[in-house]
Regions:
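Short phosphate-binding loop-to-helix
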Residues: 2-55
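Cytochrome P450 catalytic domain signature, combining two hallmark sequence patches
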Residues: 96, 146-152
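Conserved core of the sugar-phosphate nucleotidyltransferase
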Residues: 42-127, 135-138, 142, 156-164
């Protein structure tokens, strides 16, 4: 980690929201992008599209996402959240579920937040590129071993996923 100049932060095990809150307070940013560790196949072009949409929108929304509703495969989730919105909401969050799943509060209370969703042209919401189980891990491992898989377009990746 030091060799590659990557910052590592560890915080509360049970209160992920608090972990993010402390990290945000240590860094000066207007937005942060949330990508979960169980998503090793994340697509950089999805991140870039969300950034492009936010810029075109002049950063008027509080959350830019591709999961509300989900149209991309599970495991390709990207959420860009306004830090002020995130920090102000902390006092309102009572349920431990929302403290562990840090954006669930915003989606449950979507009517109070400005959310913009980036939709896939094709609905791939039934595809799972996420690693939540040993079976998921083994499937992703098989996918990664396929020559050139990581450089393929999403449609090709989905077709390969369906074939194994």
């Amino acid at each position: 980690i030091d060799k590659n100049n990557i910052k590592l932060y560890r915080g509360s095990l049970n209160n992920v929201y608090l972990r993010y809150k402390k990290l945000i307070n240590e860094n000066n940013c207007d937005y942060f992008i949330r990508i979960c560790a169980d998503s090793p196949l994340i697509e950089v072009n999805i991140i870039n599209q969300i950034l492009k949409i936010a810029k075109k929108n002049k950063f008027q929304k509080e959350i830019y996402t591709n999961i509300f509703p989900r149209t991309f495969p599970k495991g390709l989730s990207v959420e860009m959240i306004n830090t002020n919105t995130f920090l102000k909401s902390y006092k309102k969050i009572r349920l431990n579920y929302h403290k562990e799943h840090i954006t669930s509060y915003f989606y449950k209370n979507y009517m109070y937040f400005k959310i913009l969703n980036y939709k896939s042209v094709v609905d791939y919401s039934d595809i799972n590129f996420s690693i939540d189980t040993k079976n998921d891990f083994n499937k992703v491992k098989r996918l990664i071993k396929i020559k050139g898989f990581l450089k393929k377009k999403l449609k090709e990746k989905v077709n390969i996923y369906k074939s194994i």
